[in-house]
UniProtKB/Swiss-Prot annotation:
Family indicated by similarity: Belongs to the PAPS reductase family. CysD subfamily.
Pathway connected to this protein: Sulfur metabolism; hydrogen sulfide biosynthesis; sulfite from sulfate: step 1/3
SUPFAM superfamilies: Adenine nucleotide alpha hydrolases-like
N-terminal signal peptide: none
Underlying gene: cysD
Cystine pairings recorded for this chain: none
UniProt-listed PANTHER family: SULFATE ADENYLYLTRANSFERASE SUBUNIT 2
Catalytic activity from the UniProt record: sulfate + ATP + H(+) = adenosine 5'-phosphosulfate + diphosphate
NCBIfam families in alphabetical order: CysD, PRK05253.1, PRK12563.1
Protein's organism: Colwellia psychrerythraea (strain 34H / ATCC BAA-681)
Name this polypeptide is given: Sulfate adenylyltransferase subunit 2
């Protein structure tokens, strides 16, 4: 484990947090409750210690998150005493929106993308921190640290600004905003090593244990509640699995694993040859799926 490398990444991220807090009028941090959000929260607390985090955390709740994620979210808000905003798209809730009834693409657009834009508009945020990393996915590989969004929250890769060294351009007109990615230069392995080094709390779903899963289209989907339909030709099996990425439970694939400690997870990361986002069903909706979602306002 290269401590100098991790400390350099930490210092860069803390600098970005402080820059945004000083430069923008009304920032917010998107809190998805996953491992990257856990690191973001830890870095934000470090950046402004011994004071409190000077901006709220926003969780866009799709109504289909893992139960353990919601319990963990609420416990973290209680333990660390940060301001937590939770937003659900009311139109989506009224429609009974869900991945089984409306499909993954429509569900994600309504409950995540539209829900996020509603929340950003409601509170008038001009900057929003997110945990995206350039190593995750090809459209994120070309993302800036300061990602400019127009008045409709849309991302245009051709209109992004040059970033020289650690100089960031945060100028926005009324209605425009910046999405900020302090973890841009981190890798998945960096995240796990930092979590281990700093003893950062994470959702237990990242650790392997016996869980009820159904194999569907080659993906292991955990049966998290009774809303999940089980086909006549499907069988719920108890398997030792964990998650590399977390989202809506019907759209998140588990991986078979026995790694139930952080050193074991790090060892898996050193050997794996697949992207963590292979477990995200929404990334496979169509070619260039993530880039299209970002252009529509997705994070």
């Amino acid at each position: 484990m290269n401590l100098t490398h991790l400390k350099t990444l930490e210092a860069e991220s803390i600098h970005i947090f402080r820059e945004v807090a000083a430069e923008f009028d009304n920032p917010v941090m998107l809190y998805s409750v996953g491992k990257d959000s856990a690191v973001l929260l830890h870095l934000a607390r470090k950046a402004f210690a011994p004071g409190k985090i000077p901006f709220p955390l926003l969780h866009v709740d799709t109504n289909w998150k893992f139960k353990e994620m919601i319990a963990f979210r609420d416990q973290m808000a209680k333990d660390y005493d940060f301001e937590l905003l939770v937003h659900k798209n009311p139109e989506g809730i009224e429609m009974g929106m869900g991945p089984f009834t409306h499909g993954s693409a429509t569900h994600t657009d309504v409950m995540k993308t539209q829900g996020l834009k509603q929340a950003l508009n409601k509170y008038g945020f001009d900057a929003a921190f997110g945990g995206a990393r350039r190593d995750e996915e090809k459209s994120r590989a070309k993302e800036r640290v300061y990602s400019f969004r127009d008045e409709n929250h849309r991302w245009d890769p051709k209109s992004q600004r040059p970033e020289l060294w650690n100089i960031y351009n945060g100028k926005v007109n009324k209605g425009e905003s910046i999405r900020v990615f302090p973890l841009s230069n981190w890798t998945e392995l960096d995240i796990w090593q930092y979590i281990y080094l700093e003893s950062i709390p994470i959702v237990p779903l990242y650790l392997a244990e016996k869980r009820p899963v159904v194999e569907r289209d080659g993906t292991l989907i955990m049966v998290d509640d009774d809303r999940m339909p089980i086909g006549e030709d499907e069988e719920v099996q108890m398997k030792s699995v964990r998650f590399r990425t977390l989202g809506c439970y019907p759209l998140t694939g588990a991986v078979e694993s026995t790694a139930n400690t952080l050193p074991e997870i790090i060892q898996e990361m050193l050997l794996t040859k697949t992207s963590e986002r292979q477990g995200r069903v929404i990334d496979h909706d169509s070619a260039g799926s993530m880039e299209k979602k970002k252009m529509e306002g997705y994070f």
